[in-house]
A protein has these predicted regions:
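A transmembrane-helix-recognition feature enriched in membrane-embedded lipid enzymes
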Residues: 1-28, 59, 72-82
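Non-catalytic C-terminal accessory region of glycerolipid acyltransferases
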Residues: 1-9, 95-196
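Hydrophobic alpha-helical segments typical of transmembrane helices
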Residues: 5, 9, 13, 49-52, ...
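Short, basic, glycine/proline-bearing loop/turn elements
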Residues: 13-14, 81-87, 114-118
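Catalytic core of membrane glycerolipid acyltransferases/transacylases, capturing the structured
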Residues: 19, 33-91, 99
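A secondary-structure boundary/capping signal
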Residues: 28, 44, 65-66, 83, ...
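Residue-level "edge-of-site" marker
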Residues: 30, 92, 148
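A short beta-turn/loop motif at secondary-structure boundaries
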Residues: 30-33, 160-161
Length: 196
């Protein structure tokens, strides 16, 4: 299908052009092997984050993206071709969570930012427990990912990225919380996630 071709070409462009432009360094890529369902949980500092992570694995990412990105038709089509689907931020969007669960049940690799939107600085922002909830309900392990340099390369409000060095560190997969975990346990698990 056309979406697969668009995703493949975009992934090659990112790997060849953007990774070189940002002199991107990666460690821990071996934690992204296998064919089973997987949740990738990176910190979020820039609009570049999800794009730069796509070539880390040959598997196609699916991702939750803010609903406003889908309000302009050409951008909505491109985002969907890249595997994104909309989520209403700041609320428990049951429809998006249901779609994410179905994808994971089918063995997908799902990108979820535990901080929700982009944050500034080195401190971890307020964490949401969506990744923990999805992991608990589907049994998918969660891989924490650290990203440094994307905020300097393309801060909020900046339209064109600067050539700053970007470093990505992929941590080992963490087993999911217990399926029957209560909300407080999911929050505690989420706090531990990015501490890793």
């Amino acid at each position: 299908p056309v979406a697969s071709v668009v995703y493949g070409l975009t992934r090659v462009f990112i790997r060849v052009v953007l990774w070189s432009y940002f002199r991107l360094g990666v460690s821990g890529r071996e934690h992204l092997t296998g064919d089973a369902a997987l949740i990738i949980a990176p910190v979020h500092r820039s609009n570049l984050d999800s794009f730069l992570l796509a070539p880390l694995t040959r598997r196609r990412f699916r991702s939750l993206a803010k609903e406003s990105l889908f309000q302009v038709r050409p951008l909505a089509w491109f985002m969907a071709a890249l595997g994104a689907f909309p989520v209403r931020r700041g609320s428990a969007d049951r429809e998006s969570l249901r779609a994410a669960r179905l994808l994971l049940d089918e063995g997908a690799t799902l990108l979820v930012f535990p901080e929700g939107g982009r944050q500034q600085g080195d401190e971890i922002g307020e964490l949401f427990d969506g990744a923990a909830y999805l992991a608990a309900r589907t049994g998918a392990p969660v891989v924490p990912v650290g990203i440094a340099g994307t905020e300097e390369a393309m801060a909020q409000g900046v339209r064109l990225p600067r050539p700053c060095r970007v470093q990505v560190v992929v941590g080992p997969a963490l087993p999911p919380p217990d399926r029957s975990a209560k909300r407080s346990a999911l929050r505690a698990w989420t706090a531990d996630l990015l501490a890793n």
